[in-house]
């Protein structure tokens, strides 16, 4: 983590992190596509127990890395919902 002294430096670091996040989300999307092709039925796309399992794992990681749960949980729930929509589209 870089100690920033100006808003320009802060913005540069946020932009760098955003680029990394996009790269990771693109990688995640590839696995969502694979899941859409592997699952045998459309009803298998939404798996509520799995959703809750993922959210719990994320919240554990959020705690470990001092990421606010108020940010982590809604962001991941939205990510999961959008991933499900995408998975339905490629199913």
Indicate where each model-derived feature is located:
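Domain-level signature for soluble enzymes in the chorismate/prephenate branch of the shikimate pathway
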Residues: 1-91
């Amino acid at each position: 983590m870089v100690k920033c002294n100006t808003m320009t430096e802060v913005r540069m670091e946020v932009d760098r992190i955003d680029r990394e996040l996009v790269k990771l989300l693109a990688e995640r999307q590839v696995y969502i596509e694979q899941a859409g092709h592997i699952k045998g039925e459309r009803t298998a796309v939404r798996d509520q127990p799995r959703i809750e399992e993922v959210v719990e794992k994320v919240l554990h990681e959020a705690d470990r890395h001092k990421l606010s749960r108020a940010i982590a949980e809604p962001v991941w729930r939205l990510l999961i919902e959008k991933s499900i929509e995408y998975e339905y589209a490629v199913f």
